């Protein structure tokens, strides 16, 4: 049996009771180590808490070496541990498909992830639209596929959760070209970088999916002892020191409920100023009034 087990957001003890019991009985235990990190735990503390040796599974192993993970999983129990919830990344869906093609049974044990814990910032989960990812730009590569999705969310008044890039065990182009297994230091996108990249793409596209004054909420180290929220405009957050990783960003939609707004006030520097920007943004994205089609006489 292959078990996909969510670990939650921060502590080694965030695993569910059923998840922990399952880990303890598995022959092999893998920890997916490239889409996220546990902020208050490491491999050593996990092994001590679970009482099991853990094999780190990097991107290369999961995406190209899945046969190694699935080896003998039809005869013995194998655990695949994922920070957050197992289905927070499409990579894990691919692993399940591969297992089923090999006739291996699969069971999933869910847990909290940023996708539901984001509600801790005070915004209502059913007011969120499509979630988007924001990757680190380079001098020659500045993908903007997220832009259209933000525009769609904003037009119908929904908030947008932006998941910020994580670079773990990545190679430089030069090292890849030379076939050298030398990896870059880990990098985690912070709030200021995310806001700056968003503003850069808006300056290029100029379709006004958002503006420098669009209200946002910065989320840092969600679920950890140092969890922090900061509400402000995109321009303000482009200069915000968000501290240690991990980070996410929420761009507010037009339909901000008064209870959401009241909750956000505790995270702002200037309540009246923030309220004014929210009101301006709501007016900016106010849809045009519906005009019914004219009757056309049929002859």
Curated annotation (Swiss-Prot):
Keywords: Cytoplasm, Methyltransferase, S-adenosyl-L-methionine, Transferase. It is found in: Cytoplasm. Its main location: cytoplasm. One of its GO terms (cellular component) is cytoplasm. GO terms for biological process: methylation; protein histidyl modification to diphthamide. It comes from the Eukaryota. The keyword Transmembrane does not apply. InterPro entries: 4pyrrol_Mease, 4pyrrol_Methylase_sf, 4pyrrole_Mease_sub1, 4pyrrole_Mease_sub2, Dphthn_synthase. It is an enzyme of class 2 (transferase). S-adenosyl-L-methionine binds at residues 9, 85, 88, 113-114, 164, 222, 247. Its EC number is 2.1.1.314. Pfam families: TP_methylase. Pathway: Protein modification; peptidyl-diphthamide biosynthesis. The keyword Acyltransferase does not apply. It catalyses: 2-[(3S)-amino-3-carboxypropyl]-L-histidyl-[translation elongation factor 2] + 4 S-adenosyl-L-methionine = diphthine methyl ester-[translation elongation factor 2] + 4 S-adenosyl-L-homocysteine + 3 H(+). Gene3D superfamilies: Cobalt-precorrin-4 Transmethylase, Domain 1, Methyltransferase, Cobalt-precorrin-4 Transmethylase, Domain 2. One of its GO terms (molecular function) is diphthine methyl ester synthase activity. S-adenosyl-L-methionine-dependent methyltransferase that catalyzes four methylations of the modified target histidine residue in translation elongation factor 2 (EF-2), to form an intermediate called diphthine methyl ester. The four successive methylation reactions represent the second step of diphthamide biosynthesis. Belongs to the diphthine synthase family. This is Diphthine methyl ester synthase 2.
